[in-house]
């Protein structure tokens, strides 16, 4: 048996506090002098506005957030949250960090399920406290837990064995989860992902068919590459393990 917990941070990039980030860069990574001043300059002077219809609010100075999608933004977020691993290692859980996607993983035999579930619960609570210290917000509503195993082992489990309890909040196990863009089920068959990919590709092909008379062949090839081929190429190495399921595509 294995269990995967996918943590969700609310507005993750938008809640990075500039002062705390500069302190982390200095104390944890030893960045000082002109390099630290460069980062300070990069973060300083940013503002935000809100536009509704044709009305735009006055600009408000930002003391939090790093630009999501920028080259430096992801690196700064990783630096800001890197020591979250110290809170996880206490509970002997495996983990993967992908920018603002944090995942906890554990393998176990059936007799260890309760012990491992309690480790997940305590670890998530510790991460919640760590997030508060960094002015980040863990979102339990979007945090998920997924159990993996054979069909027979999954059938033996009771709901009480599978839920995460975070104080008064209960996280029920998911039947499928989206992990880095791929839908997984409890038996790791990726059937849900194949079905979703096939449906999405057919949808786009039907839409593109309507454009055939309006665009030349080169343009159509680029559109098919962007909207269809790119989806088939994603995780293509993983697809090869499920050849019998690929007839759907």
Task: Label each region the model flagged.
Residues 168-240:
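Basic, alpha-helical interaction scaffolds
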Residues 5-6, 50-76, 105-111, 164, ...:
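Short, conserved non-catalytic motifs in the polymerase core
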């Amino acid at each position: 048996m294995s269990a995967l917990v996918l943590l969700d941070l609310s507005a993750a990039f938008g809640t990075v506090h500039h002062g705390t980030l500069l302190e982390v860069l200095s104390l944890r990574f030893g960045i000082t002098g002109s390099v630290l001043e460069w980062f300070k300059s990069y973060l300083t002077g940013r503002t935000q506005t809100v536009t509704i219809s044709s009305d735009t609010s006055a600009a408000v100075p930002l003391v939090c957030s790093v630009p999501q999608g920028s080259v430096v933004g992801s690196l700064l977020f990783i630096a800001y949250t890197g020591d979250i691993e110290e809170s996880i290692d206490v509970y002997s859980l495996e983990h993967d960090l992908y920018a603002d996607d944090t995942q906890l993983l554990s393998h176990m035999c059936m007799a260890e399920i309760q012990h491992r579930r309690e480790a997940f619960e305590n670890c998530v609570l510790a991460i919640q406290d760590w997030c508060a210290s960094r002015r980040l917000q863990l979102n339990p509503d979007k945090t998920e837990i997924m159990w993996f195993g054979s069909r027979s082992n999954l059938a033996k489990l009771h709901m009480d064995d599978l839920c995460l309890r975070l104080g008064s909040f209960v996280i029920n196990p998911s039947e499928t989860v989206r992990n880095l863009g791929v839908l997984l089920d409890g038996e790791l068959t990726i059937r849900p992902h194949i079905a979703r990919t096939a449906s999405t590709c057919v949808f786009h092909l039907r839409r593109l068919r309507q454009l055939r008379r309006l665009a030349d062949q080169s343009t159509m090839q680029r559109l098919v590459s962007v909207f269809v081929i790119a989806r088939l190429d994603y995780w293509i190495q993983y697809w090869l393990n499920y050849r019998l399921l690929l007839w759907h595509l």
